[in-house]
Curated annotation (Swiss-Prot):
Top-level taxon of the source organism: Eukaryota
Cited Gene3D superfamilies: Vaccinia Virus protein VP39 (3.40.50.150)
Biological or metabolic pathway of the protein: Glycan metabolism; pectin biosynthesis
Segments for region (Disordered): 1-35
Chief localisation class: Golgi
Residue ranges annotated as Lumenal topological domain: 108-684
SUPFAM superfamilies tied to this protein: S-adenosyl-L-methionine-dependent methyltransferases
Gene deletion effect: Deformed dwarf phenotype and reduced cell adhesion. Hypersensitive to imbalanced C:N ratio.
UniProt organism field: Arabidopsis thaliana
Functional note: May be involved in the synthesis of homogalacturonan. Required for normal cell adhesion and plant development.
Membrane topology: Single-pass type II membrane protein
MF annotations from Gene Ontology: methyltransferase activity
Glycosylation-annotated residues: 161, 476
Designated name of the protein: Probable pectin methyltransferase QUA2
Length: 684
């Protein structure tokens, strides 16, 4: 019976005899000794395996059964190869690190800028690709033209759904506040009313608007009660605000009265340090319209109204306005924003909520600023009115307001200029000063705070101590230091915007949309100075566009919007004597449809795409722009070439005319000039 072969190191058969066993054991010892010796050789001569073939031939060739007797076996060569690779990798890493270190310390300032620039381009590409993923996820609907909204939404404003808020249990005025839920996003295009007409140009449009452009009934016109509302008259298809009527004289007399109560001649409010006024419940803007001739800029805010809206009519006249309610939330303005707050029968019950509403207007009022209140409550004729008046009077005193004057139904208070007033009050009198954690300079619709804000700000400067308008718009070195800026920065920004505005204005022509587009030349007529009136700057930065338009004597006012996604320059913009607001562009803007003649976005797309968390798509932003834009209104987008191209592709869904134009001063940026068509709804 044959036994199975057993192979050892030499591969020989193991015999059953004892002699063979002893021989085998002796051979094993010899082989182990030889193996140990070979390993030692391997360590001393690690590259010896490269010459294993020559060595084996030198020592007598192959072993039994075809297995080599070479001391450098296959396993040894494998181990040595791995060792060699490890050493090589270590050397490569060391050389790479040394080279990188040498390159880092030897790189010049210009090359560092070049590398940073390339890094930014790679970062922008990555973010753009991520945005693309979100757009592609829309599937076949990505390039589909949006449908038009139904007729019921002609004047719809997202986030202000009073009936829905009432159903959710909001009451006591809270139902008028702003609530942006998941259903706030609008996915259709607003059509103008059937009889809509392009507004008359400024200044004619200040006094005459088309009745069909706004939602108001004849009864609402007749029943208008306050001074500023009584100026309105219905004439055929027009609503007239007669500047030469007796009612206009009444507004002028009212303005003179306030000036006298403050202690200035006529209504030269600039002399008292007043440039910007927040007009709460502004009627239809006649107070602000009158003050424009005095270089006073008035921002109107009022609750959302489904019909007869004060904000809608004021904007239609070409005057600054926005929907704003502070029943439960703080206004989207920084602390210390306005020189004066005005309330002419504005419908706010200042004695409610234990004075919380008065605390909010104190927050946005600058030191030394004025609060003007005209109401029957100030001249009480019964116990209830007396009780409510006494509360407001005493509360105003407790927050360090001084009662300057009272005539008829009008009262004027002046805010303290000294923060020590708050610490000198008796214990328990008035609300306390906000702690550092609660004193947010620029809140964004935060709940109302029962504490006095702004006292820690470096911007606590009395209005009398500020530079008078119009010099205020060009801040000096000391003023700019409050915002961490140097005069050279603002000066360079101003020069760039002067050039940019000249270029923008020349491009607002149908010539660029022709079959053979060209830049309008010197021989082409320039667009008139009053071609635009209401301008929205979606990323205002320092307010440079606003300043350049005024310097170029264009008849515009600008709503300067500072996105919540970027640096907050809104305090500086307001301190320059402009108006503006904080806003998140992934949410609807608080205004009515068909508000603006021009919407401008400088590097807004770059700002939005750089956010780590995307809450909206590009089409969402452009759909909102379409809602805000008047028929035949213009859009100017300035951004990187890649993002401008994505924007151009997106707006095909909006049915706009569009043209991409190169920027002469920058090879990496492009302009996208668009115009919204005047598409009419078919009459039913």
């Amino acid at each position: 019976m044959s036994m199975p072969l057993q192979r050892g190191i030499s591969g020989v058969r193991v015999s059953d005899s004892s002699d063979d066993l002893r021989d085998s054991q002796m051979k094993d010892k010899t082989e182990r000794a030889r193996s140990t010796e070979n390993n030692n050789l391997t360590l001393r001569f690690p590259f010896g395996f490269l010459f294993s073939n020559q060595s084996s031939s030198k020592h007598g060739g192959g072993g039994e059964n075809g297995f080599s007797a070479d001391p450098y076996s296959a396993r040894s060569r494998h181990r040595l190869m791995l060792l060699f690779l490890k050493i090589s990798l270590v050397l490569i890493v060391v050389i790479a690190l040394a080279g990188s270190f040498w390159w880092t310390i030897s790189i010049s300032t210009s090359s560092r800028g070049h590398v940073y620039h390339n890094y930014r381009r790679l970062q922008e590409q990555l973010v753009s690709d991520l945005w693309d993923i979100g757009e592609i996820s829309l599937g076949p609907n990505r390039w589909k033209e949006l449908e038009y909204c139904n007729i019921e939404s002609e004047n719809f404003v997202p986030c202000f759904n009073v009936s829905e808020n009432l159903a959710l249990g909001y009451s006591n005025g809270d139902e008028n506040d702003r609530f942006c839920g998941p259903g706030s996003k609008q996915e259709c295009l607003e059509l103008p009313p059937v009889k809509y007409r392009v507004p008359l140009r400024w200044p004619t449009g200040k006094d005459i608007i088309w009745h069909s452009n706004v939602k108001i009934t004849a009864q609402e016109v007749v029943s208008s009660g306050s001074i500023t509302k009584r100026m309105m008259m219905m004439e055929d298809d027009q609503i007239s605000f007669r500047s030469a009527s007796p009612m206009s004289d009444e507004v002028e007399d009212y303005s003179h009265q306030i000036a006298e109560m403050i202690g200035i001649k006529k209504d030269n409010f600039i002399e008292a340090g007043v440039r910007t006024i927040l007009d709460i419940g502004c009627g239809y803007g006649s107070f602000g319209a009158h003050l424009l001739s005095k270089q006073i800029l008035t921002m109107c805010i009022a609750n959302y109204e489904a019909s007869g809206s004060q904000v809608q009519l004021t904007l239609e006249r070409g005057l600054p306005a926005m929907i704003g309610s502070f029943i439960s939330k703080q206004l989207p303005y920084p602390s210390l924003s306005f020189d004066m707050l005005h309330c002419l029968r504005c419908g706010i019950d200042w004695d409610q909520k234990d004075g919380l509403l008065l605390v909010e207007i104190d927050r946005v009022l600058k030191p030394g600023g004025y609060f003007v209140w005209t109401s029957p409550l100030t001249n009480p004729r019964n116990k209830d009115h007396l009780k409510r008046w006494n509360f407001v009077h005493d509360f105003a005193e407790s927050i360090c307001w001084t009662l300057l004057n009272q005539q008829d139904e009008t009262v004027v208070w002046k805010k303290t200029i000294n923060t020590k007033c708050y610490s000198s009050r008796k214990p328990g009198v008035g609300p306390s000063v906000c702690t550092k954690g609660h004193d947010v300079e620029s809140p964004y619709y935060r709940p109302l705070q029962m504490c006095i804000g702004g006292t820690r700000s470096r911007r606590w400067i009395p209005i009398e101590g500020r530079t008078r308008w119009p010099s205020r718009s060009n801040m000096n070195k000391t003023e700019l230091s409050l915002y961490g800026l140097h005069p050279e920065v603002l000066g360079e920004d101003a020069e760039n915007w002067k050039i940019t505005v000249r270029e923008y204005w020349s491009l607002l022509s149908p010539l660029i949309f022709s079959d053979h587009p060209k830049r309008p030349g010197d021989e082409d007529p320039s667009p008139p100075y009053n071609m635009l009136r209401n301008v929205l700057d979606m990323n205002a930065q320092f307010g440079g566009l606003n300043s350049a338009l005024l310097e170029a004597r264009k008849s515009v006012w600008v709503m300067n919007v500072v996105p919540t996604a970027g640096p907050n320059h809104l305090p500086m913009i307001l301190d320059r004597g402009f108006v503006g607001v904080l806003h998140n562009w992934c949410e609807p803007f608080p205004t009515y449809p068909r508000t603006y003649d021009l919407v401008h976005a400088d590097n807004l797309l770059s700002l939005q795409t750089s956010q780590p968390r995307k809450t909206c798509l590009l089409i969402d932003i452009f759909t909102e722009i379409d809602r805000l834009l008047r028929p035949e209104g213009w859009v100017i987008i300035r951004d990187t070439a890649q993002l401008v191209e994505k924007a151009r592709e997106t707006i095909t869904q909006l049915k706009w005319e569009a043209r991409v134009i190169e920027v002469e001063s920058s090879s990496e940026q492009r302009l996208l000039i668009c115009q919204k068509p005047f598409t009419k709804r078919q009459s039913i």
